[in-house]
Structure formats: C-alpha cells, structure tokens
C-alpha cells in the first residue's frame, strides 16, 4: 500500500525522490507528496492523483533541498486529496507514514488539549504533533523513542526536522522499511525495489527499531533507544523485470513470461538426474509433521486452497486453509506437529505477517512461500521456499500465482514421497509430467485470438460467474478475482455443485458464466451443472482440455481448450485463459491495468 522514500545527499534530491516514488507506484496509491529541507525551512508539495502530476508542479521542479522525504498514499483515514496526502508537517517536523495508528483518536484528543491544531483527517498527523510536543523537552532520540511507544498499530516512518538539516529518522513496526547506502548519500524506502536504482546495499529494519540516516553513515537503535549493529545485505540485480520491453503493460509481460518463471522454479527444486526434489535444509523430519495449515490473503489464499487438494491427494497429512485476516481472531488450538505455511508474493502482507507472528509466539513450525526473499515474512519464518518468479510489478498477480502453486505442488510431492504416501514410480511419473509443464503453458498462451472477442460479452454484462469443481474450484475463484480487480465487473466464483443452493437465483438471460470442466473425475458432474445454467439463459464459456472425446452438450456459447496433462497440472493451464480474459476486458475498457483503482500490490496494513 503506501510507499515512502527518504534521501540524505550532498546534492539536490527532489528528482531522485520523484523517480523513486514512480518505482513505488505499483504498490497502489491515490495521492503523492514530497518535502525537502533547505535554508532552514521545510518545503512541502502534495497533490491528489499520480506522481506525474506532482512532478510537473513548478514548486517541485524548483526544490533545492539536499535532504527530503516522499510518499505515495493509499487512503485509510480521510479522503484522497491534497490535504490528507503526505508528508504531514508542523513548523519543525515533517513525516511520511505507511500503516495505521489505531489509537489516533485518543492521541489527537490529548494533543488538542496541549494546544496543537490539526489540518487533516489522517491518523498520521498525530505522529507529527507527538514528536513536536516531545521535542519541547527532549532530544531527537528520546522524542522518537517516546513517540513510538505511544503509538498503537503499524507504521513505517520517514521524518525530517527543520532544526536538524543533516539527518532523516526512519522507524518501523509492522510495516516494512529498508535503508540503502550510496556514495555521499544514504536512503530510506518501503522496499528494495524503490532503492535498487540507487544502490544494491541494503539493511532491513526489524519491528521496533529506528535509525538516524546521515549522508556518510547510518545509526540503528532498538525500541529502548540503545544503539545496535545491523548487517548490510548485497542484493542481486533483476533489472529486466522492471522494464516492460515491447509490452503495453507489465501484466501482459508477466503473463507471457510464465513459461520461463515456471521453468526457473522447476530448475531450482527438481533434480532431473536423480529423479528427486531438492528442498535443502528442511528443518523437520517427515514424522514430526502430521498436519499442515496453509495461510494467505487474496490470490495467495487461492494458492493455499489449490494446494489443499494436492496435499490431500498426495499425502496422508491433515490439511486446513485459513484466510490470514481471520486466523488471529479464532480460538486456535496449536499443535506442535502442525506445519504452518505462510504464502505471500511480497512477503510483507500485514495480516499474513501477523498470523506468522502469532504462530511464532506459540512455538509453532513456520514456513514461508514468498517471491521476495528479503521480506519480513521470509526473514521471520524458520524455513523459506522462494518461488523464483522475479519482481512482479502488475498489481493483479499472475506469474506469482503460478509460482506459488508450483512450489506448493513440489512440496506436496516431496512430503508424499518422504512419508511413503506415494510410490516412487508414481512420483517419477509426476516429475516427468512436471518438467513438461512450461512447454504446455507456452502453447496455452497462444489462445489470445479466441479470448479477445469473448471479453466483449463480459464487458457488456452486469455480472458473471465462474464455476469449478475439485481442483478447478480454486481456479474459478482466482478467475473471478482477476476480472473484478482489473475490469471492475462483478464476478463470483462458486463450487459448481453449490449452484442449486442459492447462486442459481442470479442466473438470467445472457449472463456470462465461465465453467471450468477439465476431463477429470468430476467432468460429467460439472457438465450437468453447466446444463442447469444454460437452461436458465446463461451464456456459457466452457474451458476444458483437449481430448478425442466429443463434448456432449448443446447450446454452449464458446469453448476454449487448453493442452492436456495429468490432473494435478491442469489447474496451471486453466489459469491462463482466465488471466487473459481479465486483461483484455480491462484493456477494452481503457482501465489502468497495472494499477487498478483502490488496490495495492503490497497490502501492508491490516
């Protein structure tokens, strides 16, 4: 969600801050702002809308400050306008903030009683006035320490001071924050992506820590204000992921490169020579795990639902799936034999991180499936399984979804073999099929010409449904989510067998319904459910896999056939036309495909 940047340099920083804010646009935002310090004054410019609008402001172009902070805001408290945009400033302090201050109402009441006047509707402004109040009697370190201890909720902060022209303060709790190092300048940012264009040397702050950034060095402190030492990490470059190349949108590029990312993932984990799966340094023996709980949000939750079928099919483990935002609010009965798997593309999803934190506090086994190996969820889990997809820029996840289900499938195969739930011959055959998957995905991607005209019908409809059974059900949910995210068309995914229990009442003449009916064990039953919606006037888009057998059904509006493979792998192929359907629907509507309204790539608030 919100993204922050800070730069302390020996040259003017406004251009670099604007460029870094552009790197943070993928996180999702509705307003932007910048503040620099020069000639003993804090100069602040904010605007509703895109960073481009901010960049064109003549005040920004004339900024000369060599120290500054910037922000892209996703509204949580207060309307998305220039008043509520960050930075928020008093006469002496300016703050950018990612997170939510849960006790802001009480703090504001206290501060108003002290004579402070507020300009905005945001929770962030209380931080500005708290620091200002403490600075009346304390130095910067103690003022920051006292302020942070007063705040309930989550935050990543960047702070500059009128009377301290040589430093930026950064602090975090719950929301990610990184420090970068450059020649004669240092940086602060919400993630490594915003900093990579300037440096590959980075330090991540842990919860409760804060830092003081000067041009030539950085000091780190724990929550008690005691100096601590932190490691500097050197990041590898993946610059090709930040360039659209010949594609109109990052999402189009990310859909098309899925054969490559799947091939990379298979290469990382599958030992073809020895017909085995390598999951190095797995910290538990197979008999120490009797159940698995898979936890995620949004698309990652759908990945977990997909994996549940595989774990149940290929192992004798008990499997449960939880939405991360609900997990903490139930009375969980933690068992030491349960492996908790946390799935998050960014590795910074606030609700997923909070669920991980709860499991850690209860001494549970924790494993992360992430795309960003330097992320908070990865760093705080006992074991990490990276999905090796490269940076994903489009807000609507595509290649990361296939990457997540690939790694979860690989884990289910490995545990099935180790636990002797699967014979080696079957394991070998499934590995052989898996190695062919990238080629099958590549062939399925050629479906464009059929998908483009189909998308017109979805754009003209009031809503749509996506139906699936068994392995196909989580893919139906994911397809509906993609259409909602990108085209702003109401779409719902349902188990095909549930139609008669309510959803059938919504079917009307001409309503588009996607039916996922691969030729698996559930095929005939799903076709029967399809006939029920056709009988009520629905326009059915049937997505199945190629077969010599004829489809025994009448009045199907359109049929798309993906390549054939074993049942385990068909969900990968069924996903492709759904991604393209959402993409082309949004394209024809002229919407911002890479940055859909109201959404964020990295959901760092609960």
Predicted regions and their residues:
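Conserved short alpha-helical segments that host acidic/polar catalytic motifs at enzyme active sites
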Residues: 1-244, 248, 260-267, 271-288, ...
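Conserved phosphate/anionic-ligand binding catalytic regions in large, soluble enzymes, centered on
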Residues: 24-33, 98-102, 170-179, 247-251, ...
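Glycine-rich oxoanion-binding loops at beta->alpha junctions
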Residues: 49, 66-83, 271-284, 307-343, ...
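Acidic/histidine-rich
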Residues: 154-185, 454, 459-485, 520, ...
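Generic C-terminus detector
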Residues: 225, 565-606
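Glycine-rich phosphate-binding loops that contact phosphosugars or nucleotide phosphates
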Residues: 287-436, 516-560, 581, 589
């Amino acid at each position: 969600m919100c993204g922050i940047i800070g730069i302390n340099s020996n040259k003017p920083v406004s251009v670099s801050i604007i460029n870094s804010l552009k790197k943070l646009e993928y996180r999702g935002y509705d307003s932007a702002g910048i503040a620099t310090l020069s000639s003993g004054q804090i100069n602040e410019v904010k605007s509703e809308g895109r960073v481009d609008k901010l960049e064109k402001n003549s005040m920004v172009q004339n900024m000369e400050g060599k120290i500054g902070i910037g922000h892209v805001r996703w509204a949580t408290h207060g309307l998305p306008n220039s008043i509520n945009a960050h930075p928020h400033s008093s006469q002496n302090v300016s703050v950018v903030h990612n997170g939510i201050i849960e006790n802001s109402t009480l703090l504001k009441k206290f501060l108003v009683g002290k004579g402070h006047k507020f300009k905005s509707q945001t929770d962030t402004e209380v931080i500005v006035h708290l620091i200002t109040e403490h600075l009346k009697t304390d130095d910067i370190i103690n003022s920051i320490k006292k302020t942070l201890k007063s705040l309930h909720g989550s935050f990543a902060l960047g702070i500059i001071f009128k009377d301290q022209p040589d430093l930026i303060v950064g602090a975090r709790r719950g929301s990610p924050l990184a420090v970068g190092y450059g020649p004669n300048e240092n940086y602060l940012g919400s993630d490594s992506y915003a900093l990579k264009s300037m440096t590959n040397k980075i330090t991540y702050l842990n919860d409760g820590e804060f830092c003081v950034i000067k041009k030539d060095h950085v000091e780190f402190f724990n929550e008690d204000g005691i100096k601590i030492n932190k490691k500097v990490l050197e990041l590898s470059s993946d610059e090709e992921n930040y360039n659209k190349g010949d594609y109109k949108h990052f999402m189009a590029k990310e859909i098309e490169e899925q054969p490559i990312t799947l091939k990379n993932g298979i290469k990382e984990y599958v030992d073809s020579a020895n017909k085995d799966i390598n999951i190095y340094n797995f910290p538990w023996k197979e008999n120490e795990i009797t159940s698995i709980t898979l936890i995620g949000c949004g698309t990652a939750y759908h990945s977990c639902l997909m994996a549940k079928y595989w774990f149940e099919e290929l192992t004798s483990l008990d499997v449960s799936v939880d939405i991360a935002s609900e997990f903490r609010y139930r009375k969980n009965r933690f068992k030491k034999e349960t492996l908790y798997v946390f799935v998050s593309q960014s590795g910074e999803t606030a609700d997923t991180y909070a669920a991980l934190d709860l499991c850690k506090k209860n001494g549970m086994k924790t494993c992360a499936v992430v795309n960003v190996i330097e992320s908070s969820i990865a760093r705080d889990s006992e074991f990490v399984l990276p999905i090796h997809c490269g940076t994903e820029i489009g807000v609507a996840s595509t290649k990361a979804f296939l990457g997540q289900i690939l790694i979860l499938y690989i884990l289910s195969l490995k545990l099935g073999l180790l636990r002797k739930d699967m014979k080696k011959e079957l394991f070998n055959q499934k590995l052989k099929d898996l190695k062919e998957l990238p080629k099958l995905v590549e062939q399925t991607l050629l479906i464009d010409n059929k998908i483009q005209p189909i998308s017109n019908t979805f754009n003209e409809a009031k809503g749509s449904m996506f139906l699936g059974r068994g392995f196909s059900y989580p893919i139906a949910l994911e397809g509906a989510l993609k259409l909602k995210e990108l085209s702003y068309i109401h779409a719902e995914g349902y188990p095909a067998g549930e139609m008669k229990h309510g959803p059938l009442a919504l079917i009307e003449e001409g309503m588009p319904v996607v039916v996922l009916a691969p030729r698996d064990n559930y095929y005939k039953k799903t076709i029967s459910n399809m006939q029920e919606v056709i009988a009520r006037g629905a326009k059915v888009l049937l997505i199945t896999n190629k077969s010599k057998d004829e489809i025994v059904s009448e009045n199907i509006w359109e049929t798309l056939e993906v390549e054939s493979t074993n049942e385990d792998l068909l969900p990968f192929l069924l996903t492709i036309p759904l991604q393209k359907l959402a993409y082309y629907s949004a394209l024809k509507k002229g919407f911002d495909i890479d940055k859909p309204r109201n959404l964020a790539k990295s959901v760092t608030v609960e």
